[in-house]
Amino acid sequence: MRIEWACWLFGYFVSSVGSERSLSYRYHLESNSSANVVCNGNISVFVNGTLGVRYNITVGISSSLLIGHLTIQTLESWFTPWVQNKSYSKQPLSTTETLYNIDSENIHRVSQYFHTRWIKSLQENHTCDLTNSTPTYTYQANVNNTNYLTLTSSGWQDRLNYTAINSTHFNLTESNITSIHKYLNTTCIERLRNYTLEPVYTTAVPQNVTPEHAITTLYTTPPNAITIKDTTQSHTVQTPSFNDTHNVTEHTLNISYVLSQKTNNTTSPWVYAIPMGATATIGAGLYIGKHFTPVKFVYEVWRGQ
């Protein structure tokens, strides 16, 4: 049975080339209910009613393996494991083609759509155990009642220890571990208490800046605290303040954090959290617990003056 989803988002704004431009997105996916869980679709970006960029993508599990590649770079940390087609087609805004850098700021909406609408096609089971001094969790992905992947991790390691039931069914790369971590964190975070965020951050301007890229000012002076949203409740953590104006294709800041506890209970696990904010997506390297192990996540800050 063919299932079609379509979703429109209007009234979103981005500061590009010194002016405010109204954006709308159209997401469309087609899913066949078959042994191969694959969705073909497109992402279209409209600026003031004019088609700005369209990406044609294929997301899903092919007949042989669950692909670990991406359509475009800015999508990598969101749903790398589920993007099958690395190529894409882009329709620029003719003479104002530079406006396509809006994708890097708003791509979170695209990924959220795929996560909420399509990824439910997979049966996902993940458990979290924080009773010991180091967190232990298990992640298992099933497709059509077949174990495609089982992951078990004890503590925060450079790489997850994993067992693929059939190694040909899952192409596990270090980059797509990010998405798995994100899922696991959603399950675990509701059980976390009494932690504080210590900003120990550095910033790096993206390279390969060329004149053709639009100048976008990223006003990143967030409030004193932002709220972490999870399945059951909200937590508040402190965020750093910084200002950056780049002539770049992507707004990327490499930020390192150390998350520690408010309590003096040394037997409790060191934990982490993913603050979810507003429009600007920033790549962050989080250093977890006493191991200081780098794990890639996406960190969002509030945008505006």
Curated annotation (Swiss-Prot):
- What subcellular compartments does it reside in? Host endoplasmic reticulum membrane; Host Golgi apparatus membrane
User: Assembly and partners?
Assistant: Interacts with host MICA and ULBP3.
Q: Which organism is it from?
A: Human cytomegalovirus (strain Merlin) (HHV-5)
Signal peptide range: 1-19
Task: Answer yes or no on keyword Mitochondrion.
Answer: no
Q: How does it sit in the membrane?
A: Single-pass membrane protein
Gene it is expressed from: UL142
List residues in topological domain: Lumenal: 20-270
Protein's UniProt name: Membrane glycoprotein UL142
